[in-house]
Amino acid sequence: MSLREEYARQEAELDELYKEIILDHYRNPRHRGSLSSPSATHEGLNPLCGDEVTVELLVDGDRVADVAYKGSGCSISQSSASMMTEAINGKPLDDVKRLSESFTAMMRGEENVDPESLGDLEALSGVRKFPVRVKCATLAWHTLEEALEEVGI
């Protein structure tokens, strides 16, 4: 097997793994629902395709004590919201802000992003190949950033 063929095989395996991660979050969403007393609530809408998401944060001191989302839309938008809530729950607010910036940079195709800092969120990197879907993947993240502004971050 040539180096090129090996690279193509590995890329196909990675794409399949990423699809599995995205589908798992779509079928088994994490942190979907509402919080009883959120510190911040913000709604986001993608008018191009109708995706909707509401992000709720419970902030305790300098960390996200709990997070929830609800919404409707395509598998990309809803999986991204689930993956986001799983990634930020319990994390310091500064880390959440950095993660959001890194995720957004990855979705813009910037090369200065450390893939290891993103964990499973890297599974959404393939969405960049479909520019119209990037808004689906980033909807929850933009909504999170607005919720963070609501709590002064």
Please report, for each region that a protein language model flagged, where it lies by residue.
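Alpha-helical support elements that line or immediately flank enzyme active sites
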Residues: S80-P92
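Alpha-helical macromolecular-interaction surfaces
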Residues: Q78-S79, R98
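Active-site phosphate/pyrophosphate-handling residues
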Residues: V53, S82, K135
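C-terminal binding/interaction regions
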Residues: M1-S36, K91-I153
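Structured beta-strand/loop patches that form or line metal/cofactor-binding pockets in enzymes
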Residues: N28-G71
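Short, thiol/selenol-centered motifs that function as redox-active sites or metal-ligating centers
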Residues: G71-Q78
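Functionally engaged cysteine thiol sites
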Residues: C49, C74, C136
